[in-house]
Amino acid sequence: MKETLQKLRTDLIPIYGKGESDAIIRLIFHYLKGWNLTDMLIHQDDELSPFMKDEIDKILARLLKMEPIQYITGEARFHGMDLVVRPGVLIPRPETDELVDIIIDENKDREDLSVLDVCTGSGCIAIALARNLPFSKVTALDFSKEAIAVALENVQKTKTHVRIIEQDIFNWDPAEKYDIIVSNPPYVLDSEALTMEKNVLDYEPHEALFVRDDNPLAYYRRIAEIAKKALENNGKLYFEINPLKAVELEEMLKKMGFEKVETYRDSYGKLRFLKAEL
């Protein structure tokens, strides 16, 4: 096994760096063997079977083409859960995990909350909130059939109660009221693609990532319009945002009638989250 580990590190570190390479290697062995880091240390002197070596070689070949490890294994870790992900559905990010923590921390003492997650993707936000907000009723929307299928799988896998609905928000008039509306919509500017990693550009769904430079707040504007109709009194709107557009978004929401608008920084110090109340 030591030789295999050394080969993985030798091939991956020049592309991914040491920290990410080590994380990828742990994911490979968790996927193939169910091992954690302690298990890897215990078995480091073991001889891997020819079958296992062949499987690792296949995974390595895909990684060298910059395919995300989450699409290779079909899983992504999010908020303590192993969620299903597939090509066509955005891989959950650590920053989104931070957004979930903010929402839980600010609403943990409230019960029977009605929650709407817009642009749910894999369902990661909706499922994490359903698991952590007591007796909450959670609904999740997406227009993508691929996302809806994956979100439904994740609801079943995690045994959570989340209603998943296929819906284009630009052609939707909400009939229900919600205490919390949350969204991590597409927010990366088309022009930012020039500086993005190849594994994101070549494999992840562009429609879940990018917005036009000449209309960067389109999703936020529409979701805010929905929130004005659908938020209960004292309801809260939460967004994950593009730091480049934080000030512009805050100004837009205030003009739309949201009086309490607050931004939060992520663990890297970037303005990444926003809360608004009417």
List each language-model region with its residue ranges.
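Non-catalytic accessory regions of SAM-dependent methyltransferases
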Residues: 1-41
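Conserved AdoMet
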Residues: 30-105
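Conserved Class I SAM-dependent methyltransferase catalytic core
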Residues: 84, 213-277
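Conserved beta-strand segments of alpha/beta enzyme cores
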Residues: 82, 137, 161-163, 259-262
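Conserved hydrophobic residues forming the short capping helix/wall of the S-adenosyl-L-methionine
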Residues: 12, 107, 155, 227, ...
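Mobile active-site "lid"/loop adjacent to the S-adenosyl-L-methionine
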Residues: 187-219
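Short loop/edge segments at beta-strand edges and connector loops
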Residues: 73, 165-167, 241, 265
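Conserved SAM/SAH cofactor-binding pocket of Class I
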Residues: 95-195, 222
